[in-house]
């Protein structure tokens, strides 16, 4: 299965008639493995800051999580494994696997819990596969 298929079928999947706003699978080095057409153009330093927070949990809290020029307030995640951010009625979930970052961006009517479930389910599967 291609990485694009994981994005299209597993991350951008339909939940009660709704889906994530955008999603991507990105290497730890910031290289894009696959992304939805709506995924924002991001800067390498934004991915570097996210990676730093996985190594040093809490490092993003003072500045917020930035992706594609959008600033998200960092909320409770799982240190070293999952970072969650909120902005208005939407937000972001980032799950770290051995080689990649699984990123989901959502807005209402999708809920934070639905975004977490979608992103973390794929992330857990990839971890089980040694990815």
UniProtKB/Swiss-Prot annotation:
One of its GO terms (cellular component) is cell cortex. This is Profilin-3. The keyword Cytoplasm applies. It comes from the Eukaryota. Its main location: cytoplasm. Occurs in many kinds of cells as a complex with monomeric actin in a 1:1 ratio. CDD domains: PROF. Gene3D superfamilies: Dynein light chain 2a, cytoplasmic (3.30.450.30). GO terms for molecular function: actin monomer binding. The keyword Magnesium does not apply. Pfam families: Profilin.
